[in-house]
Each structure stands twice: as C-alpha cells, then as structure tokens.
UniProtKB/Swiss-Prot annotation:
The keyword Zinc is annotated on this UniProt entry: no
Protein name, per record: Phenylalanine--tRNA ligase alpha subunit
Catalytic activity: tRNA(Phe) + L-phenylalanine + ATP = L-phenylalanyl-tRNA(Phe) + AMP + diphosphate + H(+)
Keywords: Aminoacyl-tRNA synthetase, ATP-binding, Cytoplasm, Ligase, Magnesium, Metal-binding, Nucleotide-binding, Protein biosynthesis
Organism the protein comes from: Vibrio vulnificus (strain YJ016)
Cofactor: binding details: Binds 2 magnesium ions per tetramer.
Species classification: Bacteria, Pseudomonadati, Pseudomonadota, Gammaproteobacteria, Vibrionales
PANTHER family assigned: PHENYLALANINE--TRNA LIGASE, MITOCHONDRIAL, PHENYLALANYL-TRNA SYNTHETASE
InterPro entries in the cross-refs: aa-tRNA-synth_II, aa-tRNA-synth_II/BPL/LPL, Phe-tRNA-synth_IIc_asu, Phe-tRNA_ligase_II_N, Phe_tRNA_ligase_alpha1_bac, Phenylalanyl-tRNA_Synthase, tRNA-bd_arm
Quaternary assembly: Tetramer of two alpha and two beta subunits.
Top EC class, one word: ligase
Length: 327
C-alpha cells in the first residue's frame, strides 16, 4: 500500500508539472497506459495469495480513480488557460470604428431614365411599358413601316420567326396603349430595345424613351416647346436647339433635334414629328378629329452627352472604376 501512495504522489507531481495537453497525455500513458505503473500493479495481483487479491485490487482501482480525477482536472485547467490565451491574443477593440460598407449607386443609364420620367411626369405624362418580344404588327405594320423597309431585314432586327422579334423600338408600346384606351393620350414608354449593331456608338441592346401626346388640336409648336424645355432641363443649362427636317414612317412631318455643343458643333439627340394619320387609323382613331406628336430618344446617347462619355459600350462592361464616377 505504501508503494501505491508513492505512485499516486509521483503521478500528482507529474500532472501538476505538465504545462501542455501533450505533456499531460504523456503522464497519463506513464501511469494508466498498457505498460503504465498502475496497470502493472493490476497485472501483479496474480502473484498475491488469493485472500489478499480482492483488497489489493480495490486499493489499486482507488489509486487509478485518484490519478484519473487529477488528470481530468489538470486537462480542464490547461484547456481553459489555452482558451484564455487565444482570446487574449485575438481581442477585438470594440472602441475602434467598424469597417465602412461602401454604398452602391444608381447606374448612369438608370439616372438618365429617372430624370426623363421626372420631367415628363411633371407635365402629366404617364409611364407605359410593353413586351420586349414583339410581333410584326405592333413593331412594323401599325407604325406605317413598309414591307420592304430595311428595318425588317435580318441585318437590323433579331427575328425569332417572320412574325416575332426582339422589339427594335418602344413604339410598339404606343400602339398597344392606344389600342387599349381612348384619346386623349399623354405618356412616355422607356425600355430596352434591340438592333443588330455593335460599335463605339451602338450596342445590340440599348435603352429608348419614346413619348406620345394625342388629343384635339395638337400642333408642332407644342412639340417644339416641350422638347426645348426638356433638353434645357436635362442638361441643366440653356441650350441652343435645332430642328432639322427628316423622315420617319410613323410621323409626318418629321424632324431630328440637335443641340449645339460647347465646341460649336451640332449634336443629334432625338427624333420627333406629328403622328402619321395611318398610325392613328391602325388603332381606330379618327385622324380628322385627333392629332398628336411623338418623339424618341436613345438613353445612352443622352447619358454620353451629359457625362462626357465617348464609348457607349462602357455602360455595359460593369467596370467599377467607371461606374463609381457616377455615384
């Protein structure tokens, strides 16, 4: 028994001296492993007289429990110390300012659409929308576009079949809006449109805003006044505006609108005209009673002019260095 007390004392001393979990496990193996000192004591029971084995075995098992309890307590203490040391080394100073989350911003094209909608909204224009996959009637026929017009070829238009295509303009929204209502009409139709073109000033997908006003006694002077005021509002300065005679199948007379740049050169910004009588007839409106004007503008074109961007493709390349300039 005296020998067991000595083993327990030595084991407790070794346990207290262990400064890591690895060292503590070595102490466990030394005393409780297959070849450990207390295991050897159990194995030697066979050498004792039968009447002494029971009591000796109980004493050895008690000694094992004492050592196991000491090992568990020391392991718990070492794990707590290890955790505290780790927490101390990874302490977060809560008084420091947090990492700043960078705010996003509207895309410049979205900004332009919102400016256009705001201006015309203040004049009482509603915002209308329509499908981007359009049929030939709404994209061409109802707009007085002849069957042999170049816009109807594969070179300009993305066709699914001869009667179904990606819309080439938002003019189809004008037809659908007039089909589903009665004059007077006053609305704009912003949206994505598609044409088979790609270069510095064209992309296969771009944005348009088209507008229309149909009522009794509508005239070209009203159209000129509204577009002049819009351009001055959009560029936030008094701009010189020029209307040039032009041709569009769906308006008569038609004009293209230019603004004079700071370098003295004229820059085309939109097209417009009085709604062609055939367009009104196609939706059941009497052109003898009603007249109207329509206009259309490329959103990217206006955005390029407003912000001084010289390559339209930059708007769709998602380069954050470019987009962050518009926040």
């Amino acid at each position: 028994m005296q020998h067991l007390q000595e083993i327990i004392a030595n084991a407790n001393a070794a346990i207290d001296a262990a400064q890591s979990l690895v060292a503590l496990d070595e102490v466990r193996v030394q005393y409780l492993g297959k070849k450990g000192e207390l295991t050897a004591q159990l194995q030697s029971l066979g050498k004792l007289p039968p009447e002494e084995r029971r009591e000796a075995g109980q004493e050895i098992n008690k000694a094992k429990e004492v050592v196991q309890h000491a090992l568990a307590a020391r392991k718990d203490a070492l794990q707590r110390a290890e955790l505290e040391a780790k927490l101390a080394s990874e302490t977060i100073d809560v008084t420091l300012p947090g990492r700043r989350i960078e705010n996003g911003g509207l895309h410049p094209v979205t900004r332009t659409v919102e400016r256009i909608e705001q201006f015309f909204g203040e004049l009482g224009f509603n915002v209308e929308s329509g499908p981007e996959i359009e049929d030939a009637f709404h994209n061409f026929d109802a707009l007085n576009i002849a069957a042999d017009h170049p816009a109807r070829t594969d070179h300009d238009t993305f066709f699914f079949n001869p009667d179904l295509m990606l819309r080439t303009h938002t003019s189809g929204v004008q037809i659908r809006t007039m089909e589903n209502g009665k004059p007077p009409f006053r609305f704009i139709a912003p949206g994505r449109v598609y044409r088979n073109d790609y270069d510095q000033t064209h992309t296969p997908m771009f944005h348009q805003v088209e507008g229309m006003l149909v009522d009794e006694n509508v005239n070209f002077a009203q159209l000129k006044g509204i577009l002049h005021d819009f351009l001055c509002n959009f560029f936030e300065e008094e701009v010189e505006v020029r209307f040039r005679p032009s041709y569009f199948p769906f308006t008569e007379p038609s004009a293209e609108v230019d603004v004079k740049g700071k370098n003295g050169k004229w820059l085309e910004v939109l097209g417009c005209g009085m709604v062609h009588p055939n367009v009104l007839r196609s939706v059941g409106i009497d052109p003898e009673k009603y007249s109207g004007f329509a206009f259309g503008m490329g959103v990217e074109r206006l955005t390029m002019l407003r912000y001084g961007v010289n390559d339209l493709r930059a708007f769709f390349e998602n380069d954050l260095r470019f987009l962050k300039q518009f926040k």
